Amino acid sequence: MTNSKRRKGLVAASALLGGVLMLSACSGGDDDASGTKGKDTSQAKADEAAAKKSSAADIRITPKDGSDNASINNSAAVTVSKGTLTNVTMTTADGTAVAGQLSADKLSWKPSTQLERSTTYKVSAEAKDASGLVAHENASFTTVSPANSFIGNFTPEAGSTVGVGMPVSINFDKAITNKAAVQKGITVSSSSGQQVVGHWFGANRLDFRPEDYWKENSTVTLKLALDGVEGAPGVTGVQQKTVTFHIGRNQVSYVDAKTKQMKVTQDGKTVKTIPISAGSPEHKTYNGVMVMSEKFKQTRMNGATVGFTDDDGKGEYDIKDVPHAIRLTSSGTFIHGNYWGAKSVFGSVNTSHGCVGLSDTKGANDKGTPAYWFYNSSIVGDVVVISHTGDKTVQPDNGLNGWNLSWADWKAGSAV
């Protein structure tokens, strides 16, 4: 019970006791000074007894009871003064328990998991004061709704090891109009000391990169302090977290569509040269710097998904088990194994629909093929530089390919 509630209880007790004394007087007593003195003495004793029975422990629950736009991060908590917490329960409206952690000194409690959006929670707390008297407090609140909040889905994943070309890319689930406020709530730093700058691609995507590739064997830290930040009118952030990822060795591969060769370098030294087959004259491969964003040991490729269809509307090709596929653009450019083409094609003629093909065998299990070696020597974030294709340079937002912007143009896309 809070102090305010205790005071209300004492006032109620006073009124009740006063009423009893008044009825006794009306029923036939003397109205003298000694009677008034007796009433005052009885009231004082009643107040003293009530105070002794009330716990001094003062429990505070946040968010306050009735809140309907509560944060899902670090907002829910129970604290106590003049006592220690003995029991705290937190449940959703349907009774599902929420795990929590009581501090070692038993003065505070917090949920141990992030809360869900648009969910009503009930909190019940109990505490004892130094005399062993028990206090109780209850509260109910509802977290912010998805309609009134935004989150940023980021890559790479926490704890992952990626190549030197991997940007921090954040995709927001709501259009951001207050870009400066949101960008100020995000920091990206590297153990290498490299300057890192953000660049907006439209209203939903914000990428971060240094001027040159990340320093190999460094650690990058992403801090999101977006809880309560207004990204658009009536739409606030809910994320509050820090993640780190690691940069591996420096692998950059150079594909020359004219010579039809790919030179693979690690830490500046050429480790392998592989014959390739790039896009045909009718379906040229993009030029430019491209970052590996996904890897698939085997995947299906259907021409209809990228606009290559026959007159009947079906894909010009539909290969259900393309081996050793590595994505370079979101529009569908891959570097992958090819088991259906003659081995004489690689290194001599460009025949693909825009991808870069390497000699391979069906099943993706032949360790002796160039595609097997390249796939297993590569990690997400490695760089592939493609040249002499006769086509335009890939757009910087087609995949994770912001390296195709100059440093000046990259910085011009920052909101801060």
What is the role of each PLM region?
Residues 2-250, 276, 414:
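Acidic, low-complexity Ser/Thr/Gly/Pro-rich repeat segments typical of extracellular/periplasmic
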Residues 303-416:
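Exported/periplasmic cell-wall-interacting domains
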Residues 36-37, 41, 286-299, 355, ...:
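Short, surface-exposed secondary-structure junctions/capping segments
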Residues 234-343:
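Gly/Pro-biased beta-strand-loop elements
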Residues 155, 251-259, 404-416:
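Short peripheral tails and domain-boundary helices/loops at the edges of structured domains
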Residues 85, 120, 126, 173-177, ...:
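Sec-exported extracytoplasmic/periplasmic mature domains
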Residues 77, 122-124, 138, 169, ...:
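Extracytoplasmic/secreted envelope proteins and their assembly/folding machinery
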Residues 60, 77-79, 122, 169-171, ...:
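Soluble periplasmic/extracytoplasmic beta-strand elements of cell-envelope proteins
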